[in-house]
């Protein structure tokens, strides 16, 4: 087999392939064997009919078509490997010549990873916010912890922000009931914004047993994107009473004996979260600097695939009705044109980021160990509330294990760049990136949010 590569653009090539028929003998043998199992000829046992008789029955053209279709994928892969083509996406294959008994010729056009000129990472510099641990931040965490240990008490008054209520919901569109928007006995914290839009504003001032109507746009189901008249009926109203800030509460809610010890622990935890937040800001700013300074040609087909995926996700909850999407966008004060532009901009940034970080990883010989891959899988399984075995099975079935591997590798590549960059905070102090990224990871997803700080302190009580 012979192959040549034409560079059509920085991100696309055409591979020209010539395959002599003698190299197709295994493919012909495979085709005849399959035909012999499918076709019964008098005087021959199943699978034993001679090739010439089989060919006479189905025609030479049918055999050739089967052989060529079976041969193309493997010959294409062989050509890509032999020419060290860094292909991405699916190829467009065209058969250009079939000389029976002599030669098969075909071309394959495919997007490829572009050549990227990388900068001197030590010349990169970014400025980030300093780490600040305020008394207010510690008090916020203490309040969050007190709320976790608060008690709910029924009250005989109108609903106020922060109350906990039980409600019944129903909705109509153009006077017609919407069954999927009907629910009874729902529990809701007023002000949380967890249920339908407009609910929190509607229930404030309503007493138990009373109803209130308001309008809201439905976001799912047969009536997605349509304005509905929603009726909410309040069943019960409860307020949360918080425990006092004292040593007794510290002993109840944590492993500590005094309130001062609990506050000191919360301060340390806030500090760790602030470090993680700063690491995330450093990572984002270094990446932004790279994206602004490094030229990365973008493969059009790959970008288009990302845009198509964004549209698919957007209409998935709307029964794949693009008209419903357009109406929903209009009601949200935007348009389909803006949506398409945002989707394209996002796709271009995503593809550019992946190509750039992959190029950095290749240039730095970044590897991913089994322990690192396992750690990421365990983290993501926990994040989605799934057992690790179930999560692994799901990503394997979806063919996403390679994507997880690539994400870990890209994170390590970016961390390597961050460690070489110059980072200062807005006060002029130098930031030690080795302390933040010394484990080779730029992944700050695993960090607890500030809302989880108090939760961690409370969990210490379970270990006393």
Curated annotation (Swiss-Prot):
GO cellular component terms given for this protein: cytoplasm
The primary site where this protein sits is: cytoplasm
Q: Which reaction does it catalyse?
A: [protein]-peptidylproline (omega=180) = [protein]-peptidylproline (omega=0)
Please report the stretch or stretches of sequence annotated as the PPIase FKBP-type domain.
162-243
Q: What is its EC number?
A: 5.2.1.8
Q: Where is this region: Disordered?
A: 428-464
GO process terms (BP): 'de novo' cotranslational protein folding; cell division; chaperone-mediated protein folding; protein transport; protein unfolding
Arranged from A to Z, the UniProt key words for this protein are:
Cell cycle, Cell division, Chaperone, Cytoplasm, Isomerase, Rotamase
Q: What does the similarity note say?
A: Belongs to the FKBP-type PPIase family. Tig subfamily.
Q: Domain text from the record?
A: Consists of 3 domains; the N-terminus binds the ribosome, the middle domain has PPIase activity, while the C-terminus has intrinsic chaperone activity on its own.
- What PROSITE patterns does the record point to? FKBP_PPIASE
Q: Which PANTHER family match?
A: TRIGGER FACTOR CHAPERONE AND PEPTIDYL-PROLYL CIS/TRANS ISOMERASE (PTHR30560), TRIGGER FACTOR-LIKE PROTEIN TIG, CHLOROPLASTIC (PTHR30560:SF3)
Species source reads Rhodococcus opacus (strain B4)
Check the record and name the NCBIfam families matching this protein.
tig (TIGR00115)
> Has UniProt tagged this entry with the keyword Zinc?
no
Protein origin, superkingdom: Bacteria
Name of the protein described by the UniProt record: Trigger factor
Q: Where in the cell is it found?
A: Cytoplasm
The cross-references to InterPro entries, in alphabetical order and at most eight, read: PPIase_dom_sf (IPR046357), PPIase_FKBP_dom (IPR001179), Trig_fac (IPR005215), Trigger_fac_C (IPR008880), Trigger_fac_C_sf (IPR037041), Trigger_fac_ribosome-bd_bac (IPR008881), Trigger_fac_ribosome-bd_sf (IPR036611), Trigger_fact/SurA_dom_sf (IPR027304)
Q: What does this protein do?
A: Involved in protein export. Acts as a chaperone by maintaining the newly synthesized protein in an open conformation. Functions as a peptidyl-prolyl cis-trans isomerase.
